[in-house]
C-alpha cells in the first residue's frame, strides 16, 4: 500500500517536539464497490437463558438493540434444570414443562430479537452421568443423555411446542445450534467427537421430523475445531446441516486456532481462523451454507474489554472478516452474566457492551458508531480504514489507530485525500471514541469507582460519555487532517457538495 510521509515539526521556544509522521489515505468515491451487510451486528451472545427473565437483562437488550439493531441473541442452557424443561414422574416417564421457555422467547420476540437456540445443557434426570458438572457457577450438566430415545422425544416435543406457540413461519427464521463447544469441557461424551456427532445426528433428525424448515447446524466448537470432520461425517451419513458454526477469540492461541506455531498477531488471528473454516467449507463443497461465528471477542487481558481498545479491534475485525462470515456474534451484549458468579462491581473486564447497572462501556459507543457505516463498501487497501457509501450517496468512513495488546502506542496522523466527488460546501461530521470521548471507565474512576453505583450515578456516567451530535470538520482543499491517539476510533460522515468548477 503506497503512501507518502510528510514531516510536520513544531518548535516551541527551545523545545523541539518530535515529528509526527503523517500517512496519506486516498478516499476514492468512484472506487469499486461491493455489498456490505452488517454481519458484525446481526447477532449477539448473552448470559444464560434464565437471566433473560431479569429486567436488567431486558433493559440492556433494548439499549443495544437501539444502537445496533441486532436480530438474534444466543445463550447457553435453555435445557438446564433451572429452566425446568425436563422431569420424570414416579414411574420414570418423561414430563415436559415449557413455561419458562415461553417466557424467555416471548421476551426476546417482544423486543424484536429472535433466538439462536443453543441446545444445551443436559437435564440432570436425562443425564447418563448426573454428576458431570461443568465448573461454571451455575454448574450445568455436560453429560450425554442416558437414552437417545428419550433425547429424541425431548427434541421432538420441544420443536412441536415451539411451532404450536410461535408458528412455523416464525420458527423457520430461528437457528438451532447443537450444543456448545463439545471439543472441550462442555461435553462429557467418550470418545468426545464421535459421541457429539451421535448427539448431533439424533438432534438434527428429530427437529427435521417436526418440520423440514427448522434450521439446524453445528459443530459450535471452540477455537475453530472439528469443522472439516463434522462436514465429512454429516455428508457421509446424510445428516441435515443448514449452517456451520464455530467459535474463536482474538486471544486464543495460534496453535489452537490455526494449527500452527507461526507468529500471528492478535490483530490477525480471529479472521485467519474464520478464513480457515471458510476454506474447509469450500473444500467440502459446502460454501453455500451460512457460516455463523457464534462467539468472539477482543483479548481479555488487562481489562481491555472495558477500554477504548475495543473500537479499533472491532473495526479491524470487520475489515478483515468481511465476506467470510454471515454473522459474527460478539460475546456478549451485557454484563448481566454469571459464569463465574454474580458480578461484584462494574468494570472488571467482562465481555459485555454494558457494565453492571446499565453503564455504557466504550464498546457500546463503538458499536453505535460502526452501525452508521453504509450498505456498500468501497475498495481501499489501507489497513486502518473502512470506506462505505450509503443509499443517500453519503460516504461513511471509519479510521482507527490500533495498538497491539501489551504494547505502548503513539498518536498517528492521517491525511485523507478525497477523489472523484464534489467537495464544494461538503459537510463532514466527526464522532470518535478514545481516551477523551466515550470513555466511561475513566469517568467511573473519576467518580471514585463506586462498587454499587446508584441509578443517578449510572445516569450521569451515560450522559457524560454519550456521543452527541457529530462535530463539523472542514476540508483543506480536498484533504482532511486527523490525529488519532492510541486506540482511537473515528467515524466520518461525508455529505458531498456540488462538483468543483
Predicted segments — roles?
Residues 50-53, 185-190, 253-256, 301-305, ...:
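A generic structural signal for short coil/turn motifs at secondary-structure boundaries
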Residues 7-18:
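Bacterial N-terminal signal peptides
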Residues 81-85, 124-134, 184-187, 251-257, ...:
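Short acidic/His/Gly/Ser-rich catalytic and metal-binding motifs that mark active-site loops
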Residues 79, 121-123, 180-184, 220-224, ...:
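Active-site-proximal loop/turn and secondary-structure-junction residues that shape catalytic pockets
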Residues 21-175, 194-223, 237-239, 282-288, ...:
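Non-catalytic accessory regions flanking glycosidase/transglycosidase catalytic cores in CAZymes
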Amino acid at each position: 500500500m503506497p503512501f507518502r510521509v510528510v514531516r510536520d515539526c513544531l518548535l516551541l521556544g527551545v523545545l523541539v517536539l518530535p515529528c509526527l509522521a503523517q500517512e496519506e489515505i486516498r478516499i476514492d468515491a468512484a472506487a469499486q464497490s461491493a455489498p456490505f451487510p452488517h454481519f458484525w451486528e446481526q447477532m449477539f451472545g448473552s448470559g444464560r437463558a434464565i437471566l433473560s427473565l431479569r429486567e436488567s437483562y431486558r433493559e440492556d437488550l433494548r439499549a443495544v438493540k437501539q444502537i445496533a439493531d441486532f436480530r438474534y441473541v444466543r445463550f447457553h442452557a435453555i435445557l438446564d434444570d433451572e429452566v425446568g424443561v425436563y422431569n420424570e414422574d414416579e414411574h420414570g416417564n418423561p414430563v415436559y414443562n415449557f413455561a419458562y421457555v415461553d417466557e424467555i422467547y416471548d421476551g426476546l420476540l417482544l423486543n424484536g430479537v429472535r433466538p439462536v437456540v443453543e441446545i444445551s445443557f443436559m437435564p440432570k434426570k436425562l443425564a447418563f452421568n448426573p454428576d458431570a458438572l461443568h465448573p461454571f457457577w451455575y454448574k450445568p450438566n455436560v453429560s450425554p443423555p442416558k437414552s437417545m430415545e428419550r433425547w429424541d422425544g425431548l427434541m421432538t416435543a420441544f420443536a412441536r411446542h415451539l411451532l404450536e406457540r410461535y408458528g412455523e413461519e416464525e420458527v423457520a427464521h430461528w437457528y438451532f445450534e447443537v450444543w456448545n463447544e463439545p471439543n472441550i469441557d462442555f461435553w462429557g461424551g467418550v470418545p468426545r467427537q464421535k459421541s457429539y456427532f451421535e448427539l448431533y445426528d439424533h438432534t438434527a433428525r428429530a427437529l427435521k421430523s417436526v418440520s423440514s424448515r427448522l434450521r439446524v447446524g453445528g459443530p459450535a466448537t471452540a477455537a475453530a475445531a472439528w469443522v472439516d470432520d463434522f462436514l465429512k461425517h454429516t455428508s457421509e451419513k446424510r445428516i441435515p446441516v443448514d449452517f456451520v458454526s464455530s467459535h474463536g477469540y482474538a486471544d486464543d492461541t495460534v496453535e489452537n486456532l490455526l494449527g500452527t506455531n507461526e507468529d500471528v498477531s492478535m490483530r490477525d488471528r480471529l479472521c485467519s481462523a474464520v478464513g480457515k473454516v471458510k476454506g474447509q467449507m469450500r473444500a467440502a463443497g459446502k460454501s453455500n451454507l451460512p457460516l455463523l461465528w457464534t462467539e468472539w471477542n477482543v483479548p481479555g487481558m488487562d481489562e481491555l474489554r472495558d477500554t477504548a481498545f475495543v473500537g479499533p479491534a472491532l473495526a479491524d475485525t470487520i475489515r478483515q472478516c468481511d465476506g467470510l462470515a454471515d454473522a459474527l456474534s460478539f460475546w456478549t451484549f451485557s454484563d448481566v452474566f454469571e459464569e463465574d458468579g454474580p458480578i461484584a462491581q462494574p468494570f472488571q473486564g467482562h465481555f459485555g457492551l454494558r457494565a453492571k447497572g446499565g453503564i455504557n462501556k466504550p464498546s457500546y459507543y463503538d458499536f453505535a458508531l460502526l452501525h452508521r457505516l453504509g450498505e456498500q463498501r468501497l475498495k481501499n487497501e489501507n489497513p486502518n480504514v473502512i470506506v462505505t457509501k450509503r443509499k443517500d450517496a453519503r460516504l461513511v468512513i471509519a479510521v482507527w489507530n490500533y495498538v497491539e495488546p501489551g504494547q505502548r502506542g503513539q498518536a498517528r496522523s492521517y491525511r485523507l485525500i478525497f477523489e472523484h466527488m464534489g467537495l464544494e460546501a461538503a459537510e463532514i461530521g466527526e464522532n470518535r471514541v478514545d481516551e477523551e470521548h466515550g470513555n466511561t471507565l475513566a469517568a467511573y474512576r473519576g467518580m471514585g469507582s463506586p462498587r454499587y453505583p446508584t441509578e443517578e450515578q449510572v445516569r450521569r456516567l451515560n450522559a457524560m460519555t454519550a456521543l452527541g451530535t457529530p462535530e463539523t470538520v472542514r476540508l483543506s482543499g480536498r484533504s482532511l487532517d486527523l490525529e488519532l491517539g492510541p486506540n482511537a476510533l473515528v467515524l466520518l460522515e461525508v455529505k458531498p457538495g456540488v462538483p468543483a468548477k
